[in-house]
Amino acid sequence: IDALDFATAENEPDALLDVAVLDGVLIFLGTESVEFWGATGDPDLPYAPIQQRVFEQGVIATGCVVVVDNSFVWIGADGITYRNGEVPVAISDDGIVERSKASASHRLWLLEDERHKFLCQRHDGNTMLYDVTTGEWSERQSYGRSNWRAGPGLGDDETGTIWELDGYVDAGGVF
């Protein structure tokens, strides 16, 4: 790969925090915007920005976007949880937004349990779950804690060790 082959956000050049892929479209989530890039068919420039397809609401932190049911959900920089459509649609209520704004850390992951998909949104002192099927929010806690101990994880195919999913380390070593 040529070191000069790179691309940057073009419609709204802001700091990139997260990336998702939905139906072959790359979704770049920055601090202030969400930008969509589609396949071009050109081997020298396989993806390019989709013109007029930008959301003017960025993501709050890395690890705060999930692809679910032919859409994606992210925690916006304003603390509101959004689901995409032609325009972003807020799915969080005022209570969820207040918890998000008051938190210094944020995490979003998907959990499937008994035919229900839940978006798990962790803040400093609480974990809120959004049932994708019913559209209802609930709170989960572990015994003796204000927060739920569960989190996103991966299993090692050789040792069976469970790792916490993190974008910066691999079993304690840097990627």
Question: What does each model-identified segment do?
Answer:
Residues 1-9:
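A short, charged helix-loop
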